Amino acid sequence: MKFWMDKGADGWRMDVIASISKDQSFPDYPKTDGRKYYTGKYHSNGPRLHEFIHEMNREVLSKYDCMTVGEAPGSTPEVARLFTDPEREELNMIFTFEHMNIDRIPGSVNRKWELKPFDLRDLKRVMSEWQNKLYNKGWNALYFENHDQPRVISRWGNDTTYREECAKAYATVLHGMQGTPYVYQGEEIGMTNVQFPLEEYEDIEVRNAYQDLVVKNKTISEDDFRKAVWNKSRDNARVPMQWDDSENAGFTTGKPWFRLSDRYQEINVKKALEKNDSVFYYYKDLICLRHEEELLTEGDYQLLLPEDEKIFAYLRTSDKEQWIVVANLSEDTVSTEGLVKYVSDKKDIKIANYKDRTGIKADLRPYEAFMMRIR
């Protein structure tokens, strides 16, 4: 680590860092539900985990101006505080997977390939719990997409009629929270999932699951498995980056390792840069807002309308001011009646994905989102 820090590295993204300590008695996991493989209990969050990370901080990280983020599957907010509380001198932040599992059926023999319908209330509950439990005691790593997750607008939203509105809405929800937002390549132009024949997928996870679940054990049909792959495969986020509408999307003049999305001529960086109200420029505005507005970094968080199935809304509050962040994460037009009571006469729209939004009272159009200063 010292070698790379001395070379000028700015930080570390630590893959599955929660697995560096193991119970040295190496116990067997009890076989209870017919599964052949198990994860988590005996190889993650082991007895000396925090001892090792604190040593890493003491010997290396504390001696450099660097950022650290650890991948910690299975961690709760309580565990996350052990990693990220500044007084413990371990890491700056960790990636949680809890919100990534809301569309997964716990304990299913088909693992993530048995789809559970998206329920916005689950997403709000999990993300709000992390916001509140880490406030002043740690730091959140905020994300919807990465190399292991599909495109959020295809997974939980609308990637056709409202593709751009949906991409901006999810970006608004994420960037209004406390923490460090992570933007994965292509997310900033609204890239979508792909729908290839099963034999064209490169991801070893897909190939192994097909043989195990479809061919051998027959616990899921090929048709249902294909639908799940289209929804959740890691390869959705691993297609080549879409730079322009030329051959191979401008990514390479050679042969890419993986098939390009069929939509690259429609969705690419060149087109995004040519359109003033594109998803790309909306992300730039969000990032500028986070740099300029102290409240987004320091303010506390309060979820509103926790049981609403379409609206994700919350307050951010500091000693000086209060903002409301609102997103209609549905294809329907919905009323803001439940939010009006939180808004005073003083209204200041900070950012909105429908430019004619001026206040709180008008109905929310499909995937409409905004941030507004309310006092």
Language-model regions, residue ranges each:
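Active-site and adjacent substrate-binding regions of carbohydrate-active enzymes
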Residues: 1-375
